């Protein structure tokens, strides 16, 4: 009987500490703001950062996500990083990908 009481008391203490820790971590996550007005985007000079539009040829994509996947594949074939993909316009960055490991 004594071990049951001791075990249940210990279990209650552990569970209460765990619940306090999870509430604290949840409240910290809520304080992070993803609002663009609070965190303005980085001001990049896009003319210098991105070259001209990349022409992918015939695109078989039905939506923007599929088009951007084709854009990323196109940039990787040219050993470049995907710069920007918006409104069915593909830009590969000027940054090249290293060939060897």
UniProtKB/Swiss-Prot annotation:
It comes from the Eukaryota. This is Defensin-like protein 222. Keywords: Antimicrobial, Disulfide bond, Fungicide, Plant defense, Secreted, Signal. GO terms for biological process: defense response to fungus; killing of cells of another organism. Disulfide bonds join 68-85, 71-90, 75-92. It comes from Arabidopsis thaliana. It is found in: Secreted. Residues 1-21 form the signal peptide. The lineage of its organism: Eukaryota, Viridiplantae, Streptophyta, Embryophyta, Tracheophyta. Belongs to the DEFL family. The keyword Cytoplasm does not apply. One of its GO terms (cellular component) is extracellular region.
